[in-house]
Amino acid sequence: MKDMITIQNLTKTYGKHRGVEDVTFSVREGEIFGFLGPNGAGKSTTIRSMLGLIKYDQGEIRINGFDSVKDREKILADIGYMPSEAWFYPGMKIREILKYSAAVRKVDCTDEAEKLCDRLQVDVKRKINELSLGNRKKVSIICAMQHRPKLFVFDEPTSGLDPLMQNVFFELIQEYVNEGATCMLSTHVLSEVRNYCTRVAIMKEGKLFVTDTVDNLLSSRSKRIKMIRDGEKLDYIYKDNLNNLYKELEGHHIEDIIIEEPSIEEVFMHYYLKEEK
C-alpha cells in the first residue's frame, strides 16, 4: 500500500519559539489516521505546512507523490481541508457558500452537495450568521467533502456537533474511505481514534512522540493497576513486567487488586506524561 502523505524531518520555528522539530511520519492511502496531541503540540503547524499555508524551515512533505511546495496547486485540488474554526463571510446563504467553494475548485459539486446537506440536515436557504456553531461546522464539513477529494484533512471536526451528527460524519468518512479516499483526523476525542482510526501519531512539545497502530498501543505491556495497599487506594498505569510488580508488593498488605487493560485515554496520558510507576 502506497503512502498518501510522507513527512520527513519537518522543522518549523517561529522566531525563538518552537513550532515543530524533525517530525517524520507517513499516512497510508485508504486509512483513517489519527493525529493527537494537546494544544501547542505542533499539530496545526504540521497541517498548515502540509497545505502550504505556512513555509517550513527544513524537511520535505509529499502528498500523493507531489512536493508540497512545488506542486501545491495540484495537491490542493484533491484535498478536502476543514480547519478547527468555521469562519465564513457573514450574510452569505449556505447555498452561496457551497457554490463559491465549488467554483474555486472549478468543479460541479451540485449532486454531492445536495446529498451531504440532506445527510447532515443543512438548510441551504439560511444565512451563515443565523447558524449555531454546530451548524456552521456542518457547512464546513460539506465544503471539505463536496468535491470528493482523495485526501481529507480534518482539524477537530466534531466539536460542536451533537452525537447524532457525529455519527453521520463518521459514516460519511467511512463511505469515502471505502471508495479509496484517505483521512487524516486531528482530534482531542480519543474515543473517535479508538473507534475509527487504524494508526495514530502522538505529538508532544513540537516533536513526534510515537506512531503506531491503535491495536498495538492498546495491547502494549502497560497495565492499569487498581489496588488497596497498606490501607492506601492506588490507581495508576504500570509499564514494567508484572512479575516485577508482584516482587514489589512482597511485604505489603494487599486488601484488593485489579489488573486490567488501559483505555486509549490512559494510553495517551501514559505516552504524553511518561507516567511511570
Task: Indicate where each model-derived feature is located.
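Conserved ABC transporter NBD signature motif
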Residues: 59-70, 74-75
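Conserved ABC nucleotide-binding domain
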Residues: 110-132
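Hydrophobic anchor residue at the start of the ABC signature
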Residues: 141
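Catalytic Walker B motif of ABC-type/P-loop ATPase nucleotide-binding domains
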Residues: 152-156, 161
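ABC transporter nucleotide-binding domain
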Residues: 168-244
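C-terminal coupling/interaction segments
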Residues: 238-277
